[in-house]
Amino acid sequence: MVYFKAGQPEHTPRTFPLQINRSFSDKHPKVAKALRITAIVLVSLSLIALVGCIAALSGGAVIPLAAIGGIAAVTGLLSSAIAIYSAKKALAHKKQKQLADSLPLDTGTEHVQYLTTNNFRGNNWDTLEKLVQQFSQLDLTVHPSEKELLKEVFGTEYKSINQTIESISNRFAKIRSLLYQREQLYKGEERYNRYLNTPLLRKNRILTQITSNMIRLLPRSGGVFSIKANTLSRTSHTLYTILKVSLSLGVIAAVASLVIFLPPSLPIIAALGLASLSLGIAAFLMARGIRYLLERSSINRKQLAEDIQKTIGPDVLNSMAYYQHQLLSHLHETLLDEAITTKWNQPIFLEHADLELKIGDLTKQYDILNSAFEQALRNDELLRAQLEKRAYRFGSSITDNDTDNDSGATESQQTDSENDGFQEILNKGIEAAKQRREKANQSGSNKEDMFSIWKPSKHLALEDLWRASEACTEEQLSILVDNCMSYKTLECQAALQKVRLQLQTAQRSLAALENRAENAYYESNLSMMDLARANQETYRLLNILSELQQLAQYVLDR
């Protein structure tokens, strides 16, 4: 995984610039390294010689002060020049190495292994996020000083190339914005496919490869974006070399003059050493100041533009700008089409996912209510059985003890009843039952199985059943007489019917939405082919740009 390092150098093509007038040490690094080692050896020998001369002079030896002063001057000048030059080169090399180390893997085989490893989590958003953060640090802009140089290089064609440069910068900003929005746009599809989304994972892997290649190759293929205006033209570089040598000779002459006119003594020798070192540093800093002024002068910029026109010419830079625009345009259009398709299909996926969640919740509610309803029905059956047994066992004791109160009870029931017609029918039924029992007793019939409820024992007699119901609550009476359910069971049944209706409605809606969601998922998968083509095109154009950059640098070095 590629991690973005805080405080790393500016991630821009100017980190790997087109060096228009490279020095001898830049063109021949091995020879320059050998010369630096030689200079360090000479400085060491001169220091040893200086110490030896001072020791010999203190011992009485006759040594010309001019020799001591010359050695001290050379020592100070060389040591200061080597120290500052080495520090500058080391800093530039460190910046480039630090940025190169933070880039994705270089070789194709390792890069394929990096992309096809199975150590990804989820849909590979973490790896892609790190790469997008690093990709967004690419600086594809041209600073004002470089714009002035490009005006000199392209002349009348600058307006056209400037429009291309601005279009490249705008395309890059839009690509960066689309990359940051992708994870939010795919929330709906990830909810639709709640587990590992293989097509989305493949798309993210392809996009990981695209961003990785661009991070690795685009800074080294900057073209017009890698031109630095703060460099010297050939004429200015020659002038700077003459001034630097003159300053060095002036330092040596100044130290030699001091040696000639100052009396010989040990304190004077020490002062000469310090003076030579100070003059060497001052000369080197003065040379750097002269270089800074020369780099930013209008004359140097015009001469630099002439050097570019004479060597690589504006055609190579124009071609590189064209390929860069083609690269970013193709990638931007691919990502834009993907974003439009994903955003268009996102409501369908979200609605489908919400319906699935709703159906799941309703199914759980239905199962819970159904279990409660079945339990309530069983409780009602038990209660009904208990009430029937209670009415059966109400017995004749109530009848024998309360015979004298039957008429009063009947009258009281007739008075309290809200339905007089029902009470009248009930009284007639009771009277008819009494007459049937009397006839049965007079006839002495042994068929007790017939009309068993009306048998002489009066068990479960209608009037006794009615008396038993007086001791029941209204709900118990409903269960016993009307064979109804309890209030709790009725409420549970109503809730169950309501949930069943909602569940059936949601299932019908999901069935209607399923085809739309499958079509949207198929359209989303088609964008993977577009990303694959964009990956091939990106790699092809980056290779072309890299070759053009190498060609431009080769022509500049000739």
Curated annotation (Swiss-Prot):
Annotated spans, Disordered: 396-420
Domain of life: Bacteria
Composition skew (Polar residues), residue ranges: 407-416
Designated name of the protein: Uncharacterized protein TC_0561
Organism (species): Chlamydia muridarum (strain MoPn / Nigg)
Family in the record: Belongs to the chlamydial CPn_0065/CT_288/TC_0561 family.
